[in-house]
């Protein structure tokens, strides 16, 4: 079975949906003329369906007058195309309203009668926009340009960006006679004479300009009103009061800052003395016994301990722990308050040297095998 027939069977007969020319052409990727032909062939094989026709042609009584220009005469009896949607029952009545030469095509197919054609109107509007009110023969006859895709251009006036002109008093421009010399007189003279004259004239004008501007200037600020004696006294009293208030505020702020500094220094001194008195010197090392040239006791050593905090994370802290010791008396040269962070370690290399010196009779293996 062909693809278009299978699609129409499923959509129109099985699903009872409306299929238009545009739907079929988009689904099968074909032209609208080919889609109209497929709808006509499918309706001939299935007479029980309800077709919707599209009729377009020139109406009998509806005619308009088209004006090309204001000066030219209007084109009378200009033809206008009309588009009508109808079902099979009202087809003959709609065709009778149009002149001969109209065209009738099947625009849509459905399995049930359709009473309202509003959902099909947008597609009809698109078809109507493609047609034009005039033909190429009319363009040749009346002399206007024929183009189906032409759109009248609407020109917008740009807003004026120029600021309104200021009212400046017009002055008569004084031109020196030296500037307006004829070309005949300047032929045999120096080339730079004209430039020198222009510089001199410009310098004279610049000297005159400030005097003229000074005359034209008007006082911008209004004249001060004459104050009475009572108003002057009140103003002077207000100034004196404001000055006294400013001086009092500045002196009080200076005294307050000095008092704050003294209080903070005293507070820091008190904290320092309290900390010193609260933390007496604790013994870092305690000797329990001394016998046989050896000292035995315990001392505080700093060690790192890992603990868990409230959230369960491991935290390393540095703590002081008592550790017992036993050492020779002559080694300890410090007092009892000495803190020993690291335990004393004996070098292994020195031990080996001492043992080698203590056994002079020991010989190497090579010397033993060398002598026989």
UniProtKB/Swiss-Prot annotation:
Its main location: nucleus. Residues 160-173, 355-365 have a biased composition (Polar residues). GO terms for biological process: cell division; DNA strand elongation involved in DNA replication; DNA strand elongation involved in mitotic DNA replication; DNA synthesis involved in UV-damage excision repair; mitotic DNA replication lagging strand elongation; mitotic DNA replication leading strand elongation; nucleotide-excision repair, DNA gap filling. The modification Phosphoserine is found at residue 163. It holds the Pfam family CDC27. It is found in: Nucleus. Residues 156-264, 352-372 are annotated as: Disordered. The keyword Kinase does not apply. InterPro entries: POLD3, POLD3_sf. Changing residue 57 to R: Cell cycle arrest at 35 degrees Celsius. GO terms for cellular component: cytosol; delta DNA polymerase complex; nucleus. Keywords: Cell cycle, Cell division, DNA replication, DNA-directed DNA polymerase, Mitosis, Nucleotidyltransferase, Nucleus, Phosphoprotein, Transferase. Residues 174-190, 209-239 have a biased composition (Basic and acidic residues). It comes from the Eukaryota. GO terms for molecular function: DNA-directed DNA polymerase activity. Gene3D superfamilies: DNA polymerase delta, p66 (Cdc27) subunit, wHTH domain (3.90.1030.20). Heterotetramer that consist of the pol3, cdc1, cdc27 and cdm1 subunits. Cdc27 interacts with cdc1 and is required for dimerization of the tetramer. This is DNA polymerase delta subunit 3. The lineage of its organism: Eukaryota, Fungi, Dikarya, Ascomycota, Taphrinomycotina. The gene is cdc27.
């Amino acid at each position: 079975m062909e693809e278009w027939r299978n699609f129409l069977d499923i959509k129109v007969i099985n699903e009872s949906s409306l299929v238009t020319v545009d739907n079929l052409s988009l689904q099968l990727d074909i032209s609208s003329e080919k889609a109209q032909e497929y709808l006509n062939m499918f309706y001939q094989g299935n007479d029980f369906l309800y077709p919707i026709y599209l009729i377009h042609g020139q109406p009998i009584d509806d005619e308009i007058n088209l004006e090309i220009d204001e000066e030219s005469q209007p084109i009378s009896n200009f033809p206008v195309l009309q588009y009508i949607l109808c079902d099979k029952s009202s087809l003959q009545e709609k065709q009778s309203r149009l002149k001969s030469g109209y065209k009738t095509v099947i625009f849509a197919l459905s399995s049930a009668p359709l009473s309202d054609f509003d959902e099909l109107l947008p597609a009809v509007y698109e078809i109507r926009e493609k047609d034009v009110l005039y033909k190429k023969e009319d363009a040749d006859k009346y002399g206007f340009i024929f183009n189906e895709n032409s759109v009248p251009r609407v020109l917008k006036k740009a807003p004026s960006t120029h600021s309104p002109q200021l009212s400046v008093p017009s002055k008569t421009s004084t031109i020196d006679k030296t500037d307006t010399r004829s070309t005949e007189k300047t032929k045999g003279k120096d080339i730079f004479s004209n430039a020198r004259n222009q510089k001199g004239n410009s310098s004279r004008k610049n000297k005159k300009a400030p005097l003229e501007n000074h005359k034209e200037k008007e006082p911008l600020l209004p004249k001060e009103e004459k104050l009475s004696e009572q108003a002057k006294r009140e103003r002077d009293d207000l100034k004196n009061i404001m000055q006294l208030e400013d001086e009092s505020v500045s002196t009080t702020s200076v005294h307050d800052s000095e008092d704050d500094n003294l209080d903070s220094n005293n507070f820091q001194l008190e904290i320092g003395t309290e900390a010193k008195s609260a933390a007496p010197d604790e013994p870092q090392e305690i000797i329990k016994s001394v016998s046989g040239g050896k000292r035995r006791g315990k001392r505080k050593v700093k060690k790192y301990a890992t603990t868990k905090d409230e959230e369960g994370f491991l935290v390393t802290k540095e703590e002081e722990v008592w550790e017992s010791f036993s050492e020779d008396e002559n080694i300890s040269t410090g007092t009892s308050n000495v803190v020993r962070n690291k335990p004393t370690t004996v070098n292994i290399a020195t031990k080996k040297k001492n043992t080698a010196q203590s056994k002079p009779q020991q010989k190497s293996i090579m010397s033993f095998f060398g002598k026989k």
